[in-house]
């Protein structure tokens, strides 16, 4: 229930903002065969339901987004939903050529911590700051963790994962007939946990039918197969960073 309360609280905050016109608010809901984040499955390679809302005023934006997950429960935690809250500012440096985006993003996992979870991980709630530059169709984005990254902690050396970072290079290419091709490569550096660092890649194709957006993507990583497996509660040896195809359907309104 707390996860739903967080989402409703975020919705209430956005709706309470002054002078909000319908054009300032955007909503989205979707279903995907897997929730992949930075190449790693958050749902043990199983389907996910997702939804979010965004408010924009000039260059300022705020948003909330949520998805079903499995990885926390698999590690004996108690969170079935991830709730993301974010805000930032977008601006133009060179008209129609170069733009920027800076902001902060907090990932929340309500009720995640249990005694068994806390024996192996720290609090999974994570806050990152990010900055991005977009030149033509290409975007370079860097995210930097101000907290432990998703609960990762090196208990052997008593070192946290604060200062971990993610570098994301992607492009949004109109290939005609209303189709959009999105190639991506990323690098996740996890501080003080050597076998947690990896590179991921994806290639996605989507088409917008008046807000209804089906998509298909090939996703993969070079992540350590011994590190990125479900926790003990899942009783599974599935590699969560394996190469795979993900299909989805999203509705923007």
Positions of predicted regions on the chain:
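Short loop/turn motifs that connect adjacent beta-strands in outer-membrane beta-barrel proteins
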Residues: 20-24, 92-99, 174-181, 210-211
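Transmembrane beta-strands of outer-membrane beta-barrel pores
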Residues: 31-37, 57-59, 66-70, 91, ...
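Detector for outer-membrane/organellar transmembrane beta-barrel domains
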Residues: 120-191, 220
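Residues that define the transmembrane beta-barrel architecture of outer-membrane proteins
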Residues: 45-49, 79-83, 98, 123-129, ...
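Cleavable N-terminal export/targeting peptides
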Residues: 1-24
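Outer-membrane beta-barrel "beta-signal"
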Residues: 203, 207-212, 218, 237-253
